[in-house]
Amino acid sequence: MSSIKPAAKKLRLAKAGKQNRRVPMFVIAKTGGKVRTHTKMRNWRRNTLKK
């Protein structure tokens, strides 16, 4: 991808990068290990973002 990109695309990529985090440890501890993953985890190679 080019380094020069539209602002809207840059914002979308930044938001997707922030959302792509694991479940916090305190949530795993609070739920007794029942909640370990969330469905919005995305791998840059496997899943694509909407244009």
UniProtKB/Swiss-Prot annotation:
Coiled-coil residues: none
Domain of life: Archaea
GO cellular component: ribonucleoprotein complex; ribosome
InterPro entries on file: Ribosomal_eL39, Ribosomal_eL39_CS, Ribosomal_eL39_dom_sf
SUPFAM superfamilies: Ribosomal protein L39e (SSF48662)
PROSITE patterns attached to this UniProt entry: RIBOSOMAL_L39E (PS00051)
GO BP of this protein: translation
One term of GO molecular function: structural constituent of ribosome
Keywords annotated in UniProt: Ribonucleoprotein, Ribosomal protein
Family, similarity comment: Belongs to the eukaryotic ribosomal protein eL39 family.
Name of this protein: Large ribosomal subunit protein eL39
